[in-house]
Amino acid sequence: MNLSILAALALVSFSTASTEQQSPLFSHADRSPKSIIDASPFLSLHRDLVSIPSVSGNESAVGEFLASFLESHNFNVIKQPVEGRTSRFNVFAYPSSAPSKPSILLTSHIDTVPPFIPYSVQYSDNERDIVISGRGCDDAKGSVAAQVVAALETLAENPSAPLALLFVVDEEVGGAGMRAFSFNTTLNPSPDSPSSLVDGYKTIIFGEPTDLALVSGHKGMLSFHVHVTGKSSHSGYPWLGESALSTILPALSVIDKLGDIPVEKGGLPSSEKYGRTTVNIGRVEAGVAGNVVPAAADADVTVRLAAGTPEEAMDIVLAAVANATGDNPHVVVKFAEGPNGGVGGYAPQDLDTDVPGFEITTVNYGTDVPNLKVYEENDVKRYLYGPGSIHVAHGDHESITVAQLEEAVKGYKKLITAALERIY
């Protein structure tokens, strides 16, 4: 038996043990959090991933670690370069012993939002209730570790399982990592042009913090920037200038309410599945001093779409701004551009939930799901699932429990099993 299988079996023995089997063979004083983490190959992998800073744009170190780990566990690894300010790459891996090309893809992201927060553990009398903290422990290195372990356990039980792993960069910023993978005809081939490595994916399992629920879909997104040009003057003589701030405020007031206004009255659409479209004015900047009439004003806005397309939402926003400002030519709305030109963003994403045994939910946050091109001819199933809560992701109190991590391995294996049943 080779070392990779032994390692996989070690992971199996930990993560599939019942609560009773893991019960206190040691007293509270005998079991420190460090010893508990050190004793588990799975929790140690999660610790090592979280301990490596990987804020978007600086993912190379964690990518190298993950690539080395997978190679040591009998995976062939491809480091796919991703354009950017620094040299960074996606990690694509498939088992070297698999007799067939991969058709089941497990994927998550290895970048995090800033700032880096060191790994730490809070002890609990029940080992499964131990709380792990640190940047990325929840979003999304919990999913990364659980997907790796689920794949290892599956391969230990079924060495011919046609699995592949993909861990991308830049998900938290613009999705450049997933788009680079999506456009790669060797790693993500079309049905008309199969590659020597991959025939085509039948199932794609995305990892994000979903509280262990299977997600039936998430809202779409549209981002834009509002810029207003005015004319500066002394604040004692404001009529000599033109306040850009006074011009932008009515526009922002209308934009802020678009999700609450019915479509027939010029608002953004809602849906039964996703509720209402929400608008967030995330940044406003104007002027240089309190005693100067501001010559410029800017705002950044993000819209979470409950229905419709980005193009339709763009038209609604432009009409609302024109109406609020009297079609002022000094007011410019610039929308984020898509990778192939045109307006960026995406419509709501509907996902599959046909595997029994999961709670079903929808989420409001965005993912890499729309950045990965799938081919209808392949009859692709797309699942979104993972440990941890989005409510603590990105915050200074980001955390996850051992129980959630362990349950996620079982959940990913259940999804893999369903995917295998579709193939065989």
UniProtKB/Swiss-Prot annotation:
GO terms for molecular function: metal ion binding; peptidase activity. Glycans are attached at N58, N184, N323. Residues 1-17 form the signal peptide. SUPFAM superfamilies: Bacterial exopeptidase dimerisation domain (SSF55031), Zn-dependent exopeptidases (SSF53187). The keyword Hydrolase applies. Keywords: Glycoprotein, Hydrolase, Metal-binding, Protease, Secreted, Signal, Zinc. GO terms for biological process: proteolysis. Binds 2 Zn(2+) ions per subunit. It is found in: Secreted. Pfam families: M20_dimer (PF07687), Peptidase_M20 (PF01546). Zn(2+) 2 binds at D139. It comes from the Eukaryota. Its cofactor is Zn(2+). Coiled coil: none annotated. The active site is at E171 (proton acceptor). The keyword Amino-acid biosynthesis does not apply. GO terms for cellular component: extracellular region. Its EC number is 3.4.17.-. Zn(2+) 1 binds at D139, E172. Gene3D superfamilies: 3.30.70.360, Zn peptidases. PANTHER family: ACETYLORNITHINE DEACETYLASE, PEPTIDASE M20 DIMERISATION DOMAIN-CONTAINING PROTEIN. Belongs to the peptidase M20A family. This is Probable carboxypeptidase AN5749. It comes from Emericella nidulans (strain FGSC A4 / ATCC 38163 / CBS 112.46 / NRRL 194 / M139).
